[in-house]
Curated annotation (Swiss-Prot):
Protein name from the UniProt record: Toxin To5
Short name of any one Pfam family annotated for the protein: Toxin_3
Disulfide bonds: C31-C81, C35-C57, C43-C62, C47-C64
Stated family: Belongs to the long (4 C-C) scorpion toxin superfamily. Sodium channel inhibitor family. Beta subfamily.
Primary localisation category: secreted
Cysteine amide modified-residue sites: C81
Signal peptide location: 1-19
Tissue: Expressed by the venom gland.
């Protein structure tokens, strides 16, 4: 049992050190990429185009895995969507 807990702890530490950033990517205007149920293929294509490993539609927005540090994600800076 201790070995399993140690193994899970190591996996969590590896994820923390590797710094994989996952989240809702935002456009240049600060808006999230909108999607609808069943458009996982579109979100996956958008996420990989942004440098992520993959993505899916977490309605109403695309969720991306392993985004590079130069991509902004929702919540990492003030929301400016729809503002001039």
């Amino acid at each position: 049992m201790k070995a399993i807990i140690f193994f899970i702890g190591c996996l969590m530490l590896i994820d923390l050190v590797a710094g994989s950033r996952s989240g809702y990517p935002v456009t240049q205007k600060g808006c999230v990429y909108s999607c609808f149920w069943g458009s996982n293929w579109w979100c996956n294509a958008e996420c990989t185009a942004l440098g992520g490993s993959s993505g899916y539609c977490a309605w109403p927005s695309c969720w991306c895995y392993s985004l590079p540090d130069n991509r902004n994600i929702w919540g990492s800076y003030p929301n400016n969507c729809g503002k001039k």
